[in-house]
Amino acid sequence: MLKKGKIGMKPTNKIIGIVDGDVLVYRACNKAIKDNLDVRKTFDDIYEEVKMNTACDKYSLHISGGGNFRKEIEQTFLKYKGKRRDKPDNYLECRDYVAKKYKPIMVPNYEADDTASVEAFKYIKNKQLYMLITLDKDWKTIGGLFYNLLHNNLSAVSKVEGIEFFHQQLLTGDAVDNIPGIEGVGPVKANKILKDKSLIEQFEAVIKAYKKHYPEDAISRLN
């Protein structure tokens, strides 16, 4: 079980940046291969650029800990993250370097977005200001300040918007993670199902939609 007490910094009146280290590692690996660079220095440069662009007072770096508890959940339809590409040849070199130098938050069987969620929810409870720094849209389900590393822009996602986004994902699925959702349901249909409903009503509508389309295994598909 993921322990909240070991994740996060002490409360401060300054903003804490919660960084998706997985994204930075992959960026460093790909750039180093493409331009024939030292992957370790490449990571350092990328991380420093992120800090310069976001200007937070403190930073918390998160990297997936290896393995994933979701893969232990029995599924009869699609393999979780079955569509992901193989890791770059220099991935382990970069990841090990980052682990030793930066001491990121890494928990076995949990992904970076899992540990980032734990840290963010801890800050919400303590009224600590934080910024999520990633390009992974899944992090929007957490809510808060959201810095998009792909577009280099900052937006604010409320807790309600984060839950609404999660409900939409349950309906549409996630092609990147190989999560099917409901066949034939895209953003337009999902919005129609969720429109003008409270959060509880939205979740009830999601369950109803799954039971309608998949009467035999609706609940297992939602796991």
Residue ranges and their predicted role:
Residues 1-74:
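Non-catalytic, usually N-terminal nucleic-acid engagement modules in DNA/RNA processing proteins
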Residues 2-14, 33, 56, 81-223:
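Extended two-metal-dependent nuclease catalytic cores across DNA- and RNA-processing enzymes
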